[in-house]
């Protein structure tokens, strides 16, 4: 019973510190929470929690504040992600439903998430490595150069220059393009590269073998290039309101390292809990600039049958945890939505907002409204 009560005290300390950002004392806990014990008992519990590394006392006469370990315990035991209110859901749908393209939807999502959370929002464009080929067009632009225009199932349009020894006839290039589109439709870029090499080696394509091999190299390069993902960021101005001004410079440096940030949040979005949201706190990220920050991330992508968009309410909340898990498992993440803020962020609210925006983008992709 003592350990169970002690953890209730820890939860109360974390909740109060998130709300006030001031050290929490036993008197306020006794007054504001129904813990069923005296202030003296709570003081003893807080001292024990400090010994166990969940709390620290910044000053001798002050109350306690959570440590990274304390926040982790709190986050891991959040029973559910708090659903958004009906008004919040309507607001998200209203703002994001005006998107006219994938890029517009991603930019709007970053701005909206930042406004909801009061933190930095980061939204990545769909990964080329996880996208499938919809169409490729090859256009001669110089004596020995072709421009390959690649369109994926997520609406991404990528361009890649192809340098070749000599330019084949336009009819032969078009015939190769048609064959590639027929055989590679719906394949990943890496699988498309393998298929194009097979086409290059087959009879009848000798005149465009160099073009085909170069196109296969381009597919492989695009599939492996993490920098090909665009990162949409909003809300860095919110950092100016941080009380920990000394932490701002390294945090801004971390936000500039987009490849590192992309890898961190992409990995986190794939290591999610049952609600489909991942949380990393402080040193867990192994990134010096984020030592005093927390990151909340969720993947978005294609929906399977059980995770299809919820009609006119793509951010409608599942009614049960099993529904949430079903929707999470039926969505193949191809990019992420994330929020970066202080370790004393409102985790429950941030997780709800991140999940809602991720679900909207999943619906957006599933409905095919991705043309730029």
Curated annotation (Swiss-Prot):
Show the coiled coil region(s). Answer: none
State whether keyword Kinase applies: no
Q: So which domain of life are we looking at?
A: Bacteria
> Looking at the record, which segments are called Disordered?
300-334
InterPro entries in UniProt: GAF-like_dom_sf (IPR029016), HrcA (IPR002571), HrcA_C (IPR021153), WH-like_DNA-bd_sf (IPR036388), WH_DNA-bd_sf (IPR036390), WHTH_transcript_rep_HrcA_IDD (IPR023120)
Keyword Transferase in the entry? The reply is no
Set out the biological process GO terms recorded for this chain's protein: negative regulation of DNA-templated transcription
So what does this one do? Answer: Negative regulator of class I heat shock genes (grpE-dnaK-dnaJ and groELS operons). Prevents heat-shock induction of these operons.
NCBIfam families, per the entry: hrcA (TIGR00331)
Q: Which family does it belong to?
A: Belongs to the HrcA family.
HAMAP family attached to this UniProt entry: HrcA
Specify the protein name.
Heat-inducible transcription repressor HrcA
Q: Which organism is it from?
A: Bifidobacterium longum (strain NCC 2705)
Taxonomy, top ranks, is: Bacteria, Bacillati, Actinomycetota, Actinomycetes, Bifidobacteriales
